[in-house]
Amino acid sequence: MIENRPWLTIFSHTMLILGIAVILFPLYVAFVAATLDKQEVYAAPMTLIPGTHLLENIHNIWVNGVGTNSAPFWRMLLNSFVMAFSITLGKITVSMLSAFAIVWFRFPLRNLFFWMIFITLMLPVEVRIFPTVEVIANLKMLDSYAGLTLPLMASATATFLFRQFFMTLPDELVEAARIDGASPMRFFCDIVFPLSKTNLAALFVITFIYGWNQYLWPLLIITDVDLGTTVAGIKGMIATGEGTTEWNSVMAAMLLTLIPPVVIVLVMQRAFVRGLVDSEK
């Protein structure tokens, strides 16, 4: 029997509302700043009432970019989308095939290979990133989409999650496929892949956001302004030294940068939650 405790209900709802307010208030301030002009945004204290310059600020960065030596912001959004989508597609493909080989194929040292992949989770990004940059430079892949995406396609986490899921599939599926004369790739495409759709949805959302939010990697790989990404571009808008930061333009760029991942999460919300729940069963 569940006791009805009004004070507990009031307390839990109050904490929930406070938590939502703490999360949403900075976003609201950013939205208000994006609607103001340069003079209004520097007023002390800054107003919390939205202004009328949102479209003007968006048009300014959309056409002129985020600085004097910058590509238009639409180009940065396109670069970020290409990078995030390529990383997502590559991670899922490589991880699924790697996990499939480790679980369903019998070859010497397969467990050793898995643990070699898994142990990379223990290495901080800072330990791996500069050797990776050196490899990319030696392969002449600086200032290219290949340099932006290929090194980030391997994922020990996704490989581990797919391996754990594949290990829950009954052996009868393999036996039935063998009796029907299905090849390994036919078994993968017709049976394993359809059963993995919920896991794919969860990993797609997580990996897309991971790729979209990349900051350090594009900063090290890209010097061509036409290949710049949004996150690195926004950081470049913040002036250093005696320069003045146009915070209204910065916040307008931030709002545009938020739109693609928010759309992905909203569109795939149900599949994302289902994938997380099913992966725990």
UniProtKB/Swiss-Prot annotation:
Superkingdom of this protein's organism: Bacteria
UniProt cross-references to InterPro entries, sorted A to Z: MetI-like (IPR000515), MetI-like_sf (IPR035906)
Annotated organism of origin: Escherichia coli O1:K1 / APEC
SUPFAM superfamilies: MetI-like (SSF161098)
Name of the protein: sn-glycerol-3-phosphate transport system permease protein UgpE
Pfam family, one: BPD_transp_1
Function field: Part of the ABC transporter complex UgpBAEC involved in sn-glycerol-3-phosphate (G3P) import. Probably responsible for the translocation of the substrate across the membrane.
Assigned GO CC terms: plasma membrane
Gene Ontology biological process terms in this record: transmembrane transport
